[in-house]
From Swiss-Prot:
Cofactor binding notes: Binds 2 [4Fe-4S] clusters. The clusters are coordinated with 3 cysteines and an exchangeable S-adenosyl-L-methionine.
Residues noted as binding [4Fe-4S] cluster 1 in the record, renumbered to the chain: C83, C87, C90
Record EC number: 4.3.1.32, 2.5.1.147
Reaction(s) catalysed by this chain's protein: 5-amino-6-(D-ribitylamino)uracil + L-tyrosine + S-adenosyl-L-methionine = 5-amino-5-(4-hydroxybenzyl)-6-(D-ribitylimino)-5,6-dihydrouracil + 2-iminoacetate + 5'-deoxyadenosine + L-methionine + H(+); 5-amino-5-(4-hydroxybenzyl)-6-(D-ribitylimino)-5,6-dihydrouracil + S-adenosyl-L-methionine = 7,8-didemethyl-8-hydroxy-5-deazariboflavin + 5'-deoxyadenosine + L-methionine + NH4(+) + H(+)
Function: Catalyzes the radical-mediated synthesis of 7,8-didemethyl-8-hydroxy-5-deazariboflavin (FO) from 5-amino-6-(D-ribitylamino)uracil and L-tyrosine.
UniProt-listed InterPro entries: Aldolase_TIM, CofG_family, CofH/MnqC-like_C, CofH_family, Elp3/MiaA/NifB-like_rSAM, F420, FO_synthase_su2, rSAM
Entry-linked Pfam families: CofH_C, Radical_SAM
Location of region: CofH-like: 505-838
Highest taxon above the source species: Bacteria
Keywords: 4Fe-4S, Iron, Iron-sulfur, Lyase, Metal-binding, S-adenosyl-L-methionine, Transferase
Gene: fbiC
Protein name per its UniProtKB record: FO synthase
Length: 861
């Protein structure tokens, strides 16, 4: 079969010879060379596969599995065969009428699923491969009706629920293939499945966009969408299976490009656990029934090229039921895995191709010099890595079946159900719980983690991704005209004018800050507001992988800590005693904390100090709580409000532009999800602050987009209490230590951002706050002359900025904050979280103690 869409006679002898030599010598291939090698046949193919096999063997030896080829003993569970896509080669997908005529429901029932899983467990299977069509409820009313009738919001909710039952009632480990997933879907499913998967298939967009293409009419087969899923899997630290489908009309160049796209993502996140090379097999009753099957040599060459591209550490699989008896050739080409093989169920995607018997695979592997060993659905490397790749709720299930030495399946493991539950003793005080004191006296233990080179992804790939954002823009707009517009009516500033002002310097910047200060005075007057509050960061254990964050620690790190509920309540009581009206509580995404932990924290404070305003839980924490409890964001926020939550911080925003976010953070929520959390909170009457962290890999155009987004949200909901500028603290930030980020914003940046925040958010967000924690007393006073009207809080303790390297301390007294206001020539006034009047009783308590705790030590210079 010829898969090239271009006319031509194939590669020249010289180009093939050069490419083969580079492969033999272990030199990195490019797309052109890979496309040449994909066409190797005869002796050239033998040469190619021999070098690929050597690469594979080196990887197995390095992994401690020399001479081992693996497989997973599984059952195939087709949860639903309905799908919103229309792939032209697919025989798995059907329509509601056919299901009804065959006596089947729109989805398999829980009893049907568990019956298969129990039978599989009895046969020693350890994997439940759950495969289904993409979002069937979006196309088929019958699917929507089934989900509604059974109490599920969507298909993902059913997948989550049935996975828990499989874990608890059978002991099998779910491997989930629900198709295209969102970032939030990954958060929902990660706690219930050790691994997931989705074939990339191809990056050839024309096969999706052009009529007659195999993926035309299938929204979930757009290559850009599928690549985004692979990125989100990596960001979410989900062990993920992917691969390509060959022989569906792609050119050799397109096939090579698909492999390089997979390599790029694998290198960036280290999360692709296996790569499948699947050969097209035509099926009757499909639009592509007349297309010839991919030839065996096509498959062999692609496996070998994939091995060279992906390298020795990659796990490479070719489905054994899609060839006849040529197992030895697949092994010789560089595979090290046979994939899932079931002694019970058929391959529902390729029903005409039965699985080979496991004994046959063992025999064929032995003939090629390999020992066949069983693995779990999650590969041994991830079993041994543990966190953050495996959720703590899954660890007991995985460990019950895994050989602790190799990470492969334990030969004598009993497959039986275990409770799926939160780890015990989630709220036990652990670690450096005095960090709120000692960060100012002793400092942090070290400036970087020992897993610095792997935990945040591939730094070289990040440098490439960050490069476009680091290029300064050329500004041609007349700054003088922009200043005139700002002075006359800042709401009429065009994007071009706003961008020009964000670049202002010298006299133009001075004029800009004066205009912003005038707008501030007209909007909110001269009072500089502040709040007597206490920060309570209840844990710094976090595996999200934010590259700007120096606060997050692994549970075993010297600076890691978690507070008990009693300690949280004690700190709230201490704050109340010295005049606080608010506690601001945030923490790392600790894998051991249940989704209900946030409710418990809010309740603990309210029970101890009923009058305290609970300002807590960033949008990232909201999403974490919702996904861990199985609630929607709206349901979770409603429950949190009932538990005592009064408002939420608008942190985790960083820059509301995913171009920047995915450089700054590996696993934090995307922009759209941040907006969803904030707007949902506002709709429920839960107000929030808004923030922007700037001065890293961003540019003024990103700041402008961020301001415009916040203004739109405020016009829709009116729920923001203030906007807070957060200059990036670079000193201990991983993204700076890796040489990618700038060393924080300049003084010019700070003045321009503050002034433009005032102008671009006017009149929608009247309160603009500066951060003394990040800028110090003089810097904060300068911001008060540039458009700010609020100094934030006394804090009483602060660890996030201090861990990052800020040198301005962990607290300010009331007198300190009044002095900052006076330095700007303005009066100071206390406020509540919602910018209301502070009760006299609270003011008296604050005055008596100066708004800070007596046991706090002075900040060391």
């Amino acid at each position: 079969m010829t898969t090239s869409a271009t006319s031509g006679t194939g590669p020249t002898a010289n180009s093939m010879r050069r490419a083969l030599k580079r492969a033999r010598d272990g030199v990195a291939l490019d797309v052109t060379e890979a496309a040449v090698l994909l066409q190797a046949r005869g002796e050239d193919l033998d040469d190619l596969t021999a070098s690929a096999a050597r690469v594979r063997d080196a990887g197995l030896e390095a992994a401690g599995r020399a001479g081992v080829i693996t497989y997973s003993k599984s059952v195939f569970i087709p949860l639903t065969r309905l799908c919103r896509d229309k792939c032209h080669y697919c025989t798995f997908v059907t329509v509601p009428g056919k299901l009804r005529r065959a006596g089947h429901g729109m989805f398999m029932s829980p009893d049907e699923v568990l019956d298969i899983a129990r039978k599989g467990a009895a046969l020693g299977c350890k994997e439940a491969l759950i495969t289904l069509g993409d979002k069937p409820e979006d196309r088929w009313p019958e699917a929507r009706e089934w989900l509604d009738a059974h109490g599920y919001d969507d298909t993902i909710a059913y997948v989550r629920a049935i996975s828990i039952r499989i874990l608890e009632e059978t002991g099998l480990l779910p491997h989930l293939n629900p198709g295209v997933m969102s970032w939030t879907d990954f958060q929902r499913l990660k706690p219930v499945a050790p691994s997931m998967g989705m074939m990339l298939e191809t990056t050839a967009t024309r096969l999706w966009s052009e009529p007659g293409g195999p993926h035309h009419g299938s929204p979930d087969k757009e290559p850009a969408v599928r690549l985004r899923v692979l990125e989100d899997a990596g960001r979410s630290s989900v062990p993920f299976t992917s691969g390509i489908l060959i022989g569906i009309g792609e050119t050799y160049e397109e096939r090579a490009e698909s492999l390089f796209a997979l390599r790029k993502i694998s290198r960036a996140y280290h999360g692709i656990q296996e790569l499948i090379i699947q050969n097209f097999r035509a099926k009757p009753d499909t639009a592509m029934r007349g297309m010839p099957d991919a030839e065996l040599d096509e498959l062999i060459a692609t496996v070998a090229v994939a091995r060279h591209i992906m390298g020795p550490r990659a796990c490479l699989q070719a489905p054994p039921n899609l060839v006849d008896s040529e197992y030895g050739r697949l092994i010789g080409a560089g595979i090290d895995d046979w994939g899932g093989v079931s002694p019970l169920t058929i391959d529902h995607v390729n029903p005409e191709r039965p699985w080979p018997q496991i004994d046959l695979l063992r025999e064929q592997s032995a003939q090629a010099g390999f020992e066949l060993r069983e693995r779990l659905c999650v590969y041994p490397e991830f079993v041994q890595r543990g966190e953050p790749w495996l959720d703590p709720r899954l660890l007991p299930h995985v460990r019950a079946l895994a050989d602790p030495a190799s990470g492969l399946a334990h030969a004598d493991a009993t497959v039986e159900g275990h409770p799926w539950q939160e780890p015990e003793e989630a709220f036990v005080a652990q670690g450096r719980t005095d960090l709120h004191h000692s960060i100012d006296t002793e400092g942090r233990t070290g400036d970087r983690r020992d897993d610095f080179d792997v935990v945040y992804g591939d730094w070289e790939a990040l440098r490439e991704a960050a490069a476009p954002g680091m290029v300064p823009e050329r500004i041609d707009t007349d700054v003088r005209q922009a200043l005139a517009t700002a002075a006359n009516d800042p709401t009429r500033l065009t994007d071009a004018e706003a961008l020009a002002l964000l670049h202002a310097d010298g006299p133009a910047l001075d004029a800009l800050t004066r205009i912003a200060d005038d707008v501030r005075k007209a909007a909110v007057g001269d009072d500089v507001t502040y709040i007597v509050t206490r920060n309570i960061n209840f844990t710094n254990v976090c595996y999200t992988g934010c590259r700007f964050c120096a606060f997050a620690q692994r549970r075993t790190d010297a600076d890691a800590y978690t507070l008990s509920l009693e300690q949280v309540a004690d700190r709230a009581q201490q704050a109340w005693d010295v005049g606080a009206v608010e506690v601001c509580m945030q923490g790392g995404i600790h894998p051991d904390l249940p989704g209900t932990a946030y409710f418990d924290i809010a309740k603990a404070v309210k029970e101890r100090v009923p009058g305290m305003h609970v300002h807590a839980f960033s949008p990232m924490e909201v999403v974490n709580g919702a996904t861990r409890t199985g609630l929607s964001i709206r349901e979770w926020l409603t429950a949190a409000k009932e538990a005592g939550l009064d408002s939420i911080p608008g942190t985790a925003a960083e820059i509301l532009d995913d171009e920047v976010r995915w450089v700054l953070t590996k696993g934090k929520l995307p922009t759209a999800t941040w907006i969803e959390v904030i707007t949902t909170a506002h709709e429920l009457g839960i107000r929030s602050s808004s923030t922007m962290m700037y001065g890293h890999v961003d540019q003024p155009r990103h700041w402008l987009g961020h301001f415009r987004t916040l203004a739109r949200i405020q016009q829709q909901t009116g729920g923001f209490t203030e906007f807070v500028t957060l200059p990036f603290i670079h000193t201990n930030a991983p993204v700076y230590l890796a040489g990618i980020a700038r060393p924080g914003p300049t003084t010019r940046d700070n003045r321009a951002v503050m002034a433009m925040a005032r102008l671009l958010l006017h009149p929608h967000i009247p309160n603009i706050q500066t951060s003394w924690v990040k800028l110090g007393t003089e810097g904060a006073a300068e911001m008060l002359r540039s458009g700010a009207n609020d100094l934030g809080g006394t804090l009483m303790e602060e660890t996030i900025s201090r861990m990052a390297g800020s040198s301005y301390g962990s607290y300010k007294s009331v007198k300190d904050l009044i002095a900052v206001a006076e330095a700007a020539g303005r009066p100071a006034k206390p406020r509540t979280t919602l910018y209301g009047e502070v009760p006299q009783e609270r003011q008296r308590a604050a005055a008596a103690s100066d708004g800070h705790l007596p046991e706090l030590l002075p900040v060391l210079d």
